């Protein structure tokens, strides 16, 4: 007897005995998702969660009503990091099948690497796994990568990554990956993508409470998301040179760890006083943004699980977007809307740059004053390390990367949200 369940889509309501608001009904031939009027992708994702929650481990999406977007919605809801069920679907056009495969390949990488434990994904492992993923999906010969690690970070001037990670026994690392499909080694760099890669964040000496620390294996979610975004852009045909820079460290407590009052001197000459060791993501990103600026790209994008303030403002369903470039920001928001992903703008203005005073350095790593807008001042801090911060720079504060508990649409863990937005935005900008 087959254990595979067929799942159908219907615009008709369920039979009355299932309840007048029933999303699912069951019969001898399988289950039916009742959408009513329209084609509610959220309802499909919720139904997939219900079926996974019932322990159904093999599903065929059957019937004539399934298309690319509905299959994708079901996949997103059905996927569970604890128990991977098998999912099959009806035949799609060659173009739609290629797109679905590209989405699954890229977002599954993102979700899997974020869900892994900090023991499995130390800083060097994160850099290595990201490079291996991009090499595995890019055309042969288009990707080169180097990983700068340990004391080499100091000799090359990457003081922030080294300082944040020096309290850990696991070596810090910076991935410098070059995707160049042009065949010209002197081709200009179109875009630089910078990811925060804190593989575990204890908070350092500004120690997090235990309940805030439980999800901190996912503090490298910015790196996972931006790597997946580049991967999907490549699978969709990205034809310009892009560099991926991941800033990887583990923020731990030891006799060697970063201390309050320490001062970091960055490669661009800026000095930063450490007033909170739990505001470490911006310290590693600063190195990545300096390196990105050195490449003279048209576009710089950074992704980071940077602040609790963004999550407090937007919850789990949106990433925050901040930029001084209003036109570019609008284009990114449009890309997110087209890809059906949550992205919402938060304010970023010049006065935010003045909210980081230090008595001993150019900047403090946290803002001062009552009711400080934490997400905005974190982005303002980063702006000091982008050469032309007014133009061509976008900052994503990834509030929707990871869920500590399941919801009606998502299993607990990583969501992969943002991968599609980044890919579309990159390819649209590259096509101009």
From Swiss-Prot:
Mn(2+) 1 binds at residues 201, 278, 280. Keywords: Aminopeptidase, Cytoplasm, Hydrolase, Manganese, Metal-binding, Protease. Binds 2 manganese ions per subunit. Mn(2+) 2 binds at residues 196, 201, 219, 280. Its cofactor is Mn(2+). It is found in: Cytoplasm. It comes from the Bacteria. InterPro entries: Leucine_aapep/pepB (IPR011356), M17_PepB-like_N (IPR047620), Pept_M17_PepB (IPR008330), Peptidase_M17_C (IPR000819). SUPFAM superfamilies: Zn-dependent exopeptidases (SSF53187). PROSITE patterns: CYTOSOL_AP (PS00631). PANTHER family: LEUCINE AMINOPEPTIDASE-RELATED, PEPTIDASE B. This is Peptidase B. It comes from Vibrio campbellii (strain ATCC BAA-1116).
């Amino acid at each position: 007897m087959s254990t595979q369940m067929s799942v159908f889509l219907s615009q008709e309501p369920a039979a009355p005995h299932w309840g007048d608001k029933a999303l699912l009904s069951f019969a001898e031939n399988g289950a039916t998702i009742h959408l009513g009027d329209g084609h509610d992708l959220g309802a499909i994702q919720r139904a997939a969660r219900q079926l996974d929650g019932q322990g159904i481990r093999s599903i065929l999406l059957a019937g004539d009503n399934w298309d690319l977007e509905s299959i994708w919605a079901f996949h997103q809801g059905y996927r569970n990091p604890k128990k991977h069920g098998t999912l099959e679907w009806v035949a799609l056009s060659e173009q739609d099948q290629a797109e679905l495969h590209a989405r699954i390949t890229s977002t599954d990488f993102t979700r899997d690497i974020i869900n892994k434990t900090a023991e499995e994904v130390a800083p060097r492992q994160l850099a290595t796994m990201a490079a291996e993923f991009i090499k595995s999906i890019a055309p042969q010969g288009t990707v080169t990568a180097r990983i700068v690690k340990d004391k080499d970070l100091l000799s090359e001037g990457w003081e922030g990554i080294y300082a944040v990670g020096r309290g850990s026994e696991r070596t810090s690392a910076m991935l410098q990956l070059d995707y160049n499909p042009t065949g010209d080694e002197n081709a200009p760099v179109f875009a630089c993508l910078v990811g925060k890669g804190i593989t575990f964040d204890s908070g350092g000496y500004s120690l997090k409470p235990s309940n805030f620390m439980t999800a901190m294996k996912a503090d490298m979610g910015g790196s996972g998301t931006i790597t997946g975004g580049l991967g999907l852009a490549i699978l969709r045909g990205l034809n310009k040179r892009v560099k991926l820079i991941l800033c990887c460290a583990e923020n731990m407590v030891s006799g060697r760890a970063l201390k309050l009052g320490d001062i970091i001197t960055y490669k661009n000459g800026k000095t930063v006083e450490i007033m909170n060791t739990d505001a470490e993501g911006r310290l590693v990103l600063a190195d990545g943004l300096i390196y990105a600026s050195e490449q003279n790209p048209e576009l710089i994008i950074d992704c980071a699980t940077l602040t609790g303030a963004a999550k407090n403002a937007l919850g789990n369903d949106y990433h925050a977007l901040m930029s001084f470039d209003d036109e570019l920001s609008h284009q990114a928001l449009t890309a997110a809307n087209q890809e059906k992903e949550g992205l919402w703008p938060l304010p970023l203005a010049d006065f935010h740059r003045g909210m980081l005073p230090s008595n001993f350095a150019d900047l403090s790593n946290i803002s001062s004053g009552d009711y400080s807008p934490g997400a905005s001042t974190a982005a303002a801090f980063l702006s000091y390390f982008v050469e032309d911060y007014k133009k061509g720079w976008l900052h994503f504060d990834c509030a929707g990367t990871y869920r500590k508990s399941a919801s009606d649409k998502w299993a607990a863990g990583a969501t992969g949200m943002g991968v599609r937005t980044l890919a579309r935005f990159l390819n649209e900008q590259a096509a101009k």
